[in-house]
Every structure is written in C-alpha cells, then in structure tokens.
C-alpha cells in the first residue's frame, strides 16, 4: 500500500505521512551518532567516525563530520555527507552575503532558518528528493549568546540544551543526556558528558581518536574560538577522563 504514495515527495499517504522524508530520516539513523551539548561557557560537538579504513589519508581532511560555516557558527552532520556539503556551501554564502550587506555577522537563528527553508522546499516540489542529512548548529551572536540548534530533512528546526542525531542507539543517547545534563554545566563537564554518551551508544571497545571526533566552541574575550581536537589531544582527553572515572569509582 505504501508504494502508491512514496514515489514523490509531493504526495501524502492517507495517514498524513510523506514517505520520502521518512526514508531520509532512516538514512540518518544509519550514520554515526553526533552529540551537541550547550554549556554555560560554550558548546561541545562530538561525533562517531564511520570511516576508519587504515589506508585513508586523514590529513587531507580536518574533520569528517564537523564544518565551520563562519567565524561565529559551526555545524556537525549525520547522514549523507555529499548532501550536507551542498547545504554547508549555501550556508557559507548566505552568511557572507549578510555580512557584506550589513557589516555584522548573521544572527545564528536566522542562518539556521534560511538553511531549513531550502531543506523544506525539497519536500514540496516534484522531481526533487529531501536532503538525507540532519544538522547540529553551534553558534554565538550578540542577541542570544551561545545557541545550539538541530534540524532534520523535513526542514524543521529547534533550539536545544543537549541533543543527539544519527546512530542506531539514539534513544540511549537521549536518555543519558536527560539524566546527566544540568543547566550550569561547564565546558569541561560537557566534554566528559559527550564522551560518556558516545561510549554508551557505540558498539565498540577501545574508544580512541580513530573512532571519535570532538570539538568545542567558546569565547575568549571578544573573540569566538572554535577548536577541533587533534588525535593526540583527544587520546589524552579520553585517558584523563578514564582515570578520573576510575578514581571516583574507587
């Protein structure tokens, strides 16, 4: 029965469902988990790497799942990366055009809304398919300070304190975040919580920098700083967190 209604994005099923959008969301669940946590002094983004081939030259790419849109906003993705690249380039262009016109950074929510308008358009017109990617946006502006947003293939978006996208165990990730998040969480505590979430959701032992990506977004004085952990930094952080956990357990 569903096959009668899933050939085009412009057709609703009798139950009010748009199957092509649901299929796009299924593609996201097959991707590695990505976590975003809003702290009082910044934002943490962390992700599970799916590409772990030994012959892959990782030096040709800074990050597999995290991208800088502008000086004041970055994003992490889960889903089809080639779809994400199109939207990221569009977001960069939109942000640059806004700055050229108004001589100030584009408000984070306005930028997210503009990207999501494009995503929503791909669910309404014939001959197109939805973007099979979900985003976490981390940004700062003078209007609302630090902000974390999530968007999905339907074009819907919302602000979050902590959330996760992708991964087969997304419900586990959300449960861990709900149980451990607190409003006054610091950046360091948010990094540790992100590691805890990914450790719970990943089906792998020996967690290390080959399987994870970590970054944080904060302010130093008047400057917005975005830092992606190097492999050495991430391995050191994982080791330090494990030692602290062992000390607490003892």
Swiss-Prot record:
SUPFAM superfamilies: N-terminal nucleophile aminohydrolases (Ntn hydrolases). GO terms for cellular component: cytoplasm; cytosol; nucleus; proteasome core complex, alpha-subunit complex. The keyword Ribosomal protein does not apply. It is found in: Cytoplasm; Nucleus. The keyword S-adenosyl-L-methionine does not apply. SMART domains: Proteasome_A_N. InterPro entries: Ntn_hydrolases_N (IPR029055), Proteasome_alpha (IPR050115), Proteasome_alpha-type (IPR023332), Proteasome_asu_N (IPR000426), Proteasome_bsu_CS (IPR016050), Proteasome_sua/b (IPR001353). It comes from the Eukaryota. Keywords: Cytoplasm, Nucleus, Proteasome. One of its GO terms (biological process) is proteasomal protein catabolic process. Pfam families: Proteasome, Proteasome_A_N. PANTHER family: PROTEASOME SUBUNIT ALPHA/BETA (PTHR11599). The 26S proteasome consists of a 20S proteasome core and two 19S regulatory subunits. The 20S proteasome core is composed of 28 subunits that are arranged in four stacked rings, resulting in a barrel-shaped structure. The two end rings are each formed by seven alpha subunits, and the two central rings are each formed by seven beta subunits. The catalytic chamber with the active sites is on the inside of the barrel. Belongs to the peptidase T1A family. The proteasome is a multicatalytic proteinase complex which is characterized by its ability to cleave peptides with Arg, Phe, Tyr, Leu, and Glu adjacent to the leaving group at neutral or slightly basic pH. The proteasome has an ATP-dependent proteolytic activity. This is Proteasome subunit alpha type-4. It comes from Dictyostelium discoideum.
